[in-house]
């Protein structure tokens, strides 16, 4: 502990430092519970600045005599042979810069509370003829009187500090010294013109603008560029958001005047209505943006069924306004618009003005992405529900099921008011729609008529290529089943389970009659789940999203039970004994056989491998022999519909599955960017491995990174859905169960990314920040792929090859995508070389049985 004149401090308790001094947290020697701030100034550093130090001490003593609540008080000044110590009161809340770093932006209640106190402090020093000349968030200290970790803003007291650049100005005297921080300097100061105390008013306006929007009103990469901007711009107009209240808008415009003579006077500033009048309710930022955005004003926002309402960002007070805010994530997924021939097209609204990083364009006239493959019932638009389209080969079966259910509900409500009763087959509706419906009634949207489907707004991305022109990686790699628990990075990357259906009506009826005789160890046939499906709440969310790929079903009312328990998949976990024979998945394969232990054998896709055409079997996979006896009355395996379809159909389906897998990875990357701890850890890893860290962990920067990733995902999804629509219209892609499932997944992911992008855009981005210019989706994808390879290499090094398979597979997929999309031949060569290196590692893992290669 260093001691002097009744005070002590430790050099480890550093609070901050400046050009001439270091500030420590100290205390009284005889009162150790009373903290103080000790500014230690080494005499060797002030040999040429003694006058500056003397002036600061004089100003601090002058202001301390006022004992003003909003000015940092000087407790004692002590000189030793080596140092000059200024002992000042300690502020336990940090400074405004730290507060803004945590909160990003402040609501107007908080801004008003802070600016009133700043005005009181400024009024006090102005009466003494003092101009601060270095007002910035770092010199505005906060005192937390509540002693709580997260105090309410009304418990925070503002104190002005650091009068090192302050000076006395007599009436009418102008200064011409260049000092202060360039971003907060008044134009007359940075242009080396004479200035007076009104320079502090400009700094106050800049600080208020930053509190409101999270960025400075005028930004340049260097001080000379900012100076040049001020010199050539005669009329400075800050871009104040529309949701700003009139009083605050007026105050900002009057503070941020280029000419000091036109700037608001101190008297008018101290008595401005924003400081003296209670705040009037102002429109929410999100409501105003919703009103002018064509996507929010003229469309129903549809959230994925599995997504939760968008939470409020941690640490942000922007949404704390008492005015009601319309949450984007609250609209139910089943709300869809029924298109009628007489309905006018929505008029496009004004484009988003605050965020220029991307623009939502109107639908293209020549083509549009396909809507989710579902029929729309002929009920009112507000009560529209979605029904799955039956597989063409199963329409007769589906119709018989509906007739049997209708006969069992003779005493129930009429089918016209029942969601289930209205879900007749697409074929049945097509036969009777002209006789039953007038020309002006809503028409049923069928997959055979893609031109009638509602059009989705398309996101254009000049850096990304269309999915149609993308080639599939050859080979693709599939991670084999393992009893090892997946790592957190791969928690949401569980492979899809096999979804099959009976081949014909006889199989379906037989399944109903023989349900009680089926052996749970050999039953694998499933169809899309209904309300009677077994509870899956215990399954992790990521596993649920990937393992159940059936299209989402509408809610079934209690008075309309469906007799489809026979289509449920028997849970292997509930089997009293594990099978002793190889676990059989119909016409499919496994990487291992089940043992007599209680471990669960994970299903693998062979005929419907992700990204594979479905006609090839992986090496080491074992196809179910046709002559295997079906014990315990089990049904013979049904023929997979994808086998009999054309090769082009299989290739397109494989490409759609590849996009779904890739978008899952992009969403995972974007969610990682939302976690400040994960970003800080990534920056730390980069510092340890390369010696330098280029990762920016600020909240606006992370939001910008999330936004570009979500926009890239939106483009890929839009392109994939457009590809599907075109090929469905040309009868190349058939509406099979697998196609419906993957299109439903793509549709859900599209709405999830769209809602999240709009949420991020509504928070605002510092568009003039030069750090934002280097953000790109390709850079983020490349960095993530390299990090996956590094983590996988460490897993191999420490003898955990079972953990690295998924990481290598994901990196292989992302490197292939980047190599397909880049335009630079040199970049493509580097990416291809890295991809080949990862492929070699996967080949080694293939020989060890951890992955299986499939030629596409």
From Swiss-Prot:
Gene Ontology molecular function terms on file: ATP binding; metal ion binding; protein serine kinase activity; protein serine/threonine kinase activity
Annotated consequence of substituting residue 841 to H: In E1120; paralyzed, egg laying defective and dumpy
Segments for region (Disordered): 304-327, 362-391, 405-471, 520-582
Site (described: Required for interaction with lgg-1): 357
Domain annotation Protein kinase: ranges: 9-275
Catalytic site positions: 134 (proton acceptor)
Segments carrying motif LIR: 358-361
Disruption of the gene: reported phenotype: Worms exhibit various abnormalities in axonal elongation and axonal structures. RNAi-mediated knockdown causes abnormalities in constitutive dauer formation in daf-2 e1370 mutant including a lack of autophagosome formation.
Region of interest called Required for interaction with unc-14 and vab-8, as start-end residue ranges on this chain: 750-856
Cited SMART domains: S_TKc
Compositionally biased residues, Polar residues: 365-385, 527-536, 566-578
GO cellular component: autophagosome; axon; cytoplasm; cytosol; neuron projection; neuronal cell body; phagophore assembly site; phagophore assembly site membrane
Effect of residue 39 to M: In KSEX9; variable effects
One GO BP: regulation of multicellular organism growth
Alphabetical list of InterPro entries matching this protein: Atg1-like, ATG1-like_MIT2, Atg1-like_tMIT, Kinase-like_dom_sf, Prot_kinase_dom, Protein_kinase_ATP_BS, Ser/Thr_kinase_AS, Ser/Thr_kinase_Unc51
Effect ascribed to mutating residue 39 to R: Impairs kinase activity
Signal peptide feature range: none
Binding site for ATP: 15-23, 39
Enzyme Commission code(s) on record: 2.7.11.1
Catalytic activity of the protein: L-seryl-[protein] + ATP = O-phospho-L-seryl-[protein] + ADP + H(+); L-threonyl-[protein] + ATP = O-phospho-L-threonyl-[protein] + ADP + H(+)
General function of this protein: Protein kinase important for axonal elongation and axonal guidance. Functions in the CAN axons to direct both anterior and posterior migrations. Phosphorylates both unc-14 and vab-8. Component of the unc-51/atg-13 complex that is probably recruited by lgg-1 to preautophagosomes and is required for autophagosome formation. Interaction with autophagy related proteins such as atg-13 links it to the autophagy machinery to in turn promote P-granule degradation in somatic cells. Plays a role in mitophagy during limited food availability. Regulates cell size.
Comment field on protein domains: The LIR motif (LC3-interacting region) is required for its interaction with lgg-1.
Family: Belongs to the protein kinase superfamily. Ser/Thr protein kinase family. APG1/unc-51/ULK1 subfamily.
Protein name listed in UniProt: Serine/threonine-protein kinase unc-51
Source species of the chain: Caenorhabditis elegans
Name of the encoding gene: unc-51
